């Protein structure tokens, strides 16, 4: 069926508004629960979808730089003490780590969808890593 253009139509009167009963009017004018307004809440999933769109658009690093740097230094300490890192080296490690994690979560999400679920679980991560050949 072809779409047609809608044009504005002039109102032709209609019904006149009826007067409300006294109790209804009093109930509507008085604020609910002593004037305390509830904070606005979005429906479940709305904020999650908004965050997904925002993070897919962005290119900035998602893990904070200093905590990641401390983690790198802590892991490197097991191999050799008093190691020094150039800032560009830590940045390259962080880029690689985040790219790996994003890819792993994409594959994990596919595993969850394949199982007819929308929630990812540890078994999805294990399956994704096993298919990739990272873990036997």
From Swiss-Prot:
Acetylation is generally linked to gene activation. Can be acetylated to form H3K9ac, H3K14ac, H3K18ac and H3K23ac. H3K9ac could compete with H3K9me and prevent gene silencing. H3K9ac is restricted to euchromatin. Methylated to form mainly H3K4me, H3K9me, H3K18me, H3K23me, H3K27me and H3K36me. H3K4me1/2/3, H3K9me3, H3K27me3 and H3K36me1/2/3 are typical marks for euchromatin, whereas heterochromatic chromocenters are enriched in H3K9me1/2 and H3K27me1/2. H2BK143ub1 is probably prerequisite for H3K4me. The modification N6-acetyllysine is found at residues 10, 15, 19, 24. The modification Phosphoserine is found at residues 11, 29. Residues 1-43 are annotated as: Disordered. It is found in: Nucleus; Chromosome. One of its GO terms (molecular function) is structural constituent of chromatin. The modification Phosphothreonine is found at residue 12. Its main location: nucleus. Keywords: Acetylation, Chromosome, DNA-binding, Methylation, Nucleosome core, Nucleus, Phosphoprotein. GO terms for cellular component: nucleosome; nucleus. The modification N6-methylated lysine is found at residues 5, 10, 19, 24, 28, 37. Gene3D superfamilies: Histone, subunit A. It comes from the Eukaryota. It holds the Pfam family Histone. Belongs to the histone H3 family. The nucleosome is a histone octamer containing two molecules each of H2A, H2B, H3 and H4 assembled in one H3-H4 heterotetramer and two H2A-H2B heterodimers. The octamer wraps approximately 147 bp of DNA. Core component of nucleosome. Nucleosomes wrap and compact DNA into chromatin, limiting DNA accessibility to the cellular machineries which require DNA as a template. Histones thereby play a central role in transcription regulation, DNA repair, DNA replication and chromosomal stability. DNA accessibility is regulated via a complex set of post-translational modifications of histones, also called histone code, and nucleosome remodeling. This is Histone H3.
